[in-house]
Amino acid sequence: MEAFIKETGRAVVIPNDSINTDIILPKQFLKNILKTGFGPHLFYDWRYLADGKINPKFELNKPEHAGATVLITGVDFGSGSSREHAVWALTDYGFRAVIGGSFSDIFYMNATKNGLLPIVLPEAERQILRDIKPDETITIDLPNQIVTYNNNQFHFDINPQWQAKFINGEDDIDVTMKFEAAITAFEKKQPNFD
């Protein structure tokens, strides 16, 4: 997992509430277990018209939003079925963080385990962030748990263990491997049933 300490980048706003995992990545694209290749299918039914052509009105398709690394959204983001693929689509597209009013518990956990930082901010603060212009940047300072935009600073909470994993660029396997010697020693002490 790529370390996340401080991210300064452009943001795109999709202010809708209740964006579920089938909207984030429709079910027909769940045929792969690799974590890459899903970005082109992100928000597929919104990004593309019925004939398969790009929908020029959708925010992600506007040239001024190309390369955005932060998604600002509404409440209840990631509801619906549990699919890590939805998180993989967001990260494969290039998002490093999603700022919302709330997240589905399962989506939140999938995000933290796959290097996508979910940040919960109240409506008043997200309303200020919704005014971000395509040429402006937003900064997320994870060690200090601060989102900065246009001289506004917003504090967010994160579990200290998840924060450490992001800062150190460690997933669950990396953390487990820190205990490899202890695991091996434990295994050697167990009786052999061969």
Swiss-Prot record:
CDD domains: IPMI_Swivel. This is 3-isopropylmalate dehydratase small subunit. NCBIfam families: leuD, PRK01641.1. The keyword Lyase applies. It catalyses: (2R,3S)-3-isopropylmalate = (2S)-2-isopropylmalate. It comes from Leuconostoc citreum (strain KM20). Catalyzes the isomerization between 2-isopropylmalate and 3-isopropylmalate, via the formation of 2-isopropylmaleate. Its EC number is 4.2.1.33.
